[in-house]
Amino acid sequence: MASAAIYYHPEAYSIGGPKLMGRNAAGESFLRGFLLHTNTSEYWVQVEQQVHAQTFAATRKQLGQAHPVKVVDKNSLGALSQPGVIYYPGPGIGEHAWHRAAFGHGAYSLCGITHTTSSAGAMDSIAALISAPVQAWDAVICTSTAVKTHVEKLLQAQANYLVDRLGLQKLVLPLLPVIPLGIHTQDFVFNATQKTAARKTIDADKDTLVVLFMGRLSFHAKAHPLAMYQALEKAAQLNPSKKIVLVECGWFANDFIEKAYQSAAKLSCPSVRVVTLDGREAQNRTVAWASADVFCSLSDNLQETFGIVPIEAMAAGIPVVVSDWDGYKDTVRDGVDGFRIPTTMPGPGLGGDLALRHALEIDTYDMYCGHTCSFISVDVEATAIAFNQLFSSPELRKKMGEAGMERAREVYDWAAIIPQYEKLWDEQNEIRKAQGGSLKPLANPWPARMDPFTAFSHYPTKLLNADTKLTLNDDSLETSINLLNDYRALAMVNFAKLVLPSEDECQAILNALNRSTLSAGDIIQSVPAERHAFVFRALNWLLKIGILKVVT
């Protein structure tokens, strides 16, 4: 079974940097998994600087490996024909295909991998795969079915443009296999002594229910916590005799975001004690994993593509409550490992302005993520029901935790994942050797930008449409108005005020639904025609913050 040369830059494979992101954690975990589970005895590495090769060798030495490393740099790219495949820790293999062209398109194969696919840079690199000299023996690993669908949408949109612009008749695409990220499941096994000590650290006795969120604490770019807070409060009201603790183990980018979390939790889940741990510290992560009874991640963000943390929770034997969103659809079996909660998003055609603001750099990527996630809702009632089921049944928690642990070990441990990588690399070599002739390069157009609600329309459980029946979540119009005003005042809601409906428009919506149930198409008749699309989209924002609910 073949292995591959590894394109190595320390930043891509380390969690020690100043701005820890999911791709860093995934890269570090992959490298460790590769070094521990590869079948090769000959290591190749491509570097930009020789010092990086020394860092790679030191990493291997820490794992007890002493095999020599063969180093390739920009002055010796042709040597990559010896390992036959080069693995890059990102999707942008188009740039490297141009580098390869000097040595012949069939000199070696390229293999990349997706992380987020919603940023301008990621979409540019994916769209560029069509115009760059990428070949049928190249591959971009998609970490989930959801991200593969988005990659295919981007590629199709770019191909359509080239057909219209240049009369494109020939299309050569890389392989797009779905191979999930892996974890080291043994890292998440804790004994009874560790669990007792961890719960003592957060002042949780054996009868306290500990719910854990693990990851970046970023309402605009990771998982907006308002739905989780609201659902926990509902569950707390259903279990008045139980003490509930929410552990948020992560890190805030700044004081503004930290204060936004604090004010939202104070308003939305006053019955729940919130403990915040700095997730950049390994000891805090151990405390979080070892103390938790239930894990929750209600991701509602376009930048999420796989979501490794629920699998880590499963490896720790913790039942999970997650949104029915992106990669979670693949990893978490609803009703088996935990619960997947329905999500709703506006349909295609309602986000072109958001895409354009991002494309023209009026909005930063963070603001683009925040604006789009403002219109993506997670079903609070279903979340509360899931919490209540788990809170009420230690047996269910144990059953789901054990099922998740078994799945994590059998499906998502690197011992099971690395052989899938090496099988792919074998396939790439076989295709290249059979088909490796010279091919004409395609033209190089500027990449596409898509309406986010078109590009990601497959992420949610359902799409809001004109026939969707809506009503007020509270029977009282006055209460609904007061709640809306309270939520609008929250920093984590108000930050997106530029794309939210006016107070008059909100009042018109609430008045229309006072003591009645209407379709979304009928509701927007209460505002001027030129505002129909804007207000239609805003109905999903009102669903998101719990003012409206869907009537089924």
Predicted regions and their residues:
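Acidic donor-binding loop of glycosyltransferase active sites
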Residues: 290-305, 318
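Extended catalytic core of nucleotide-activated donor transferases of GT-like folds
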Residues: 51-133, 549
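Conserved catalytic-core segment of nucleotide-activated headgroup transferases in glycan assembly
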Residues: 184-280, 448
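C-terminal amphipathic helix plus adjacent low-complexity
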Residues: 358-512, 519-522
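Carbohydrate-associated surface elements
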Residues: 146, 182
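Short alpha-helical donor nucleotide-sugar binding micro-motif in glycosyltransferases
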Residues: 279-282, 287-292
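Short hydrophobic beta-strand element within catalytic cores of glycosyltransferases
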Residues: 319-322, 332, 339-340
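N-terminal pre-catalytic "stem/leader" segment of glycosyltransferase-like enzymes
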Residues: 1-83
